[in-house]
């Protein structure tokens, strides 16, 4: 259940109660696609750096380890040693972006695995069944993820199908949560708003899915090629039509600047691979912008990645040492960068929550963006 604590303009400060603990929002979910953050980051590390929610992916866990095996283990929480909330993506985005030879039917999608080419079928019921086996805290509804350049007629048909699929997801989750062998009988369901950059289709879809009284609502199909301005325009149009007494989740977004702008528009949940992906390539986030530690100017730099940062890396190690590890292709260097980046994001969300509580979110956002744009 979502509890709105306070607002500053459209920015919301809330709490979301789940069977695995209360989530303080706005929140950034750390992405562990197959049950682990890429970059040799453990669940103990996640606890140390203040992670509230871990995100894993239904499609990847289904085609690799297998959700039935994970259910036998007692669910994803026990499997990966994590006792806080987990959100599982429905697999829809991966089916439409990774899998080959897709055939979209009313019943679902027929496709070939991107791992071994085997034929797989996934529809709303199958996605819910897999996520129930994983026993995640929050399950995402199975949706179609049309191309951002899809024409209007296709987008309207796609959105209508996504609504029908959402109703089937809700019915199947209710059925699964009533079964005696279901691990998490309190699994929550978030629906997903689609519609590309067509503002009127987005708004109509938001109004339709809001009537289904779900646990939360996501805005999907953004950050897939459109400009930042288009993304913010869609958020301005859509978020006011989603229930204000439920959390709003902007999927796959994004940069620190994206998050700061979206919070101001009323978004509560975020996820993105940027902190870990960039960290694995030696790019680290700081309050003065992004740094490339491969740059020669850091070769003898005795300072931490960011002075004043309390992450496990900055408390002990210098830029020069982390750069040395990266240049030597030591996994420790990659791990250090990922840890720092995730800590930076988690800390930024803490600052965001404090700024909303203090009624100075707009000032905080402008100061943060200005500092990050200045560079070192």
Region spans (language model):
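Conserved, mostly hydrophobic/aromatic
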Residues: 21, 54, 89, 131, ...
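Surface-exposed helix-capping loop/turn segments at secondary-structure junctions
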Residues: 172-182, 246, 352-364
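C-terminal extensions of enzymes
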Residues: 1-15, 23-32, 39-40, 143-149, ...
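A non-catalytic, amphipathic alpha-helix used as a structural packing/dimerization or gating element
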Residues: 126, 130, 157, 161-168, ...
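Non-catalytic, usually N-terminal nucleic-acid engagement modules in DNA/RNA processing proteins
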Residues: 1-183, 296-299
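Glycine- and acidic
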Residues: 147-151, 156, 216-222, 331-334
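Glycine-rich phosphate/ribose-binding loops and adjacent secondary-structure elements
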Residues: 163, 172, 176, 184, ...
């Amino acid at each position: 259940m979502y509890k709105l604590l306070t607002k500053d303009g459209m920015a919301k400060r809330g709490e979301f109660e789940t069977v695995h603990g209360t989530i303080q929002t706005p929140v950034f979910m750390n992405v562990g696609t197959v049950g682990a953050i890429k970059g040799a980051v453990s669940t103990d590390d996640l606890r140390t750096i203040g992670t509230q929610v871990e995100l894993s992916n239904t499609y990847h866990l289904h085609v690799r380890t297998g959700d039935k095996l994970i259910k036998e283990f007692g669910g994803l929480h026990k499997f990966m040693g994590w006792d806080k909330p987990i959100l599982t993506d429905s697999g829809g985005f991966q089916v439409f972006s990774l899998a080959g030879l897709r055939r979209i039917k009313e019943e679902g999608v027929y496709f070939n695995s991107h791992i071994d080419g085997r034929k797989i079928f996934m529809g709303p019921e199958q996605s819910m069944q897999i996520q129930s086996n994983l026993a995640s805290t929050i399950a995402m509804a199975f949706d179609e993820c049309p191309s951002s350049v899809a024409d209007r007629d296709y987008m309207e048909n796609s959105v209508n199908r996504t609504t029908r699929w959402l109703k089937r997801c809700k019915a199947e989750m209710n059925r699964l949560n009533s079964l005696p062998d279901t691990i998490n009988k309190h699994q929550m369901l978030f629906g997903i708003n689609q519609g590309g950059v067509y503002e009127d289709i987005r708004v109509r879809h938001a109004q339709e899915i809001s009537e289904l009284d779900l646990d939360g609502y996501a805005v999907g199909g953004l950050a897939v090629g459109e400009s930042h301005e288009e993304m913010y325009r869609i958020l301005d149009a859509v978020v006011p039509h989603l229930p204000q007494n439920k959390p709003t989740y902007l999927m796959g977004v994004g940069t620190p600047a994206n998050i700061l702008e979206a919070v101001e528009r009323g978004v509560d949940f975020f996820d993105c691979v940027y902190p870990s992906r960039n960290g694995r390539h030696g790019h680290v986030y700081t309050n003065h912008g992004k740094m490339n530690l491969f740059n020669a100017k850091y070769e003898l730099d005795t300072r931490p990645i960011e002075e004043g940062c309390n992450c496990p890396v900055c408390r002990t190690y210098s830029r020069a040492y982390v750069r040395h590890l990266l240049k030597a292709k030591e996994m420790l260097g990659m791990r250090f960068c990922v840890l720092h980046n995730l800590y930076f994001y988690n800390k930024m969300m803490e600052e965001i929550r404090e700024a909303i509580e203090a009624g100075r979110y707009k000032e905080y956002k402008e100061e943060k963006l200005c500092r990050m744009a200045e560079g070192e």
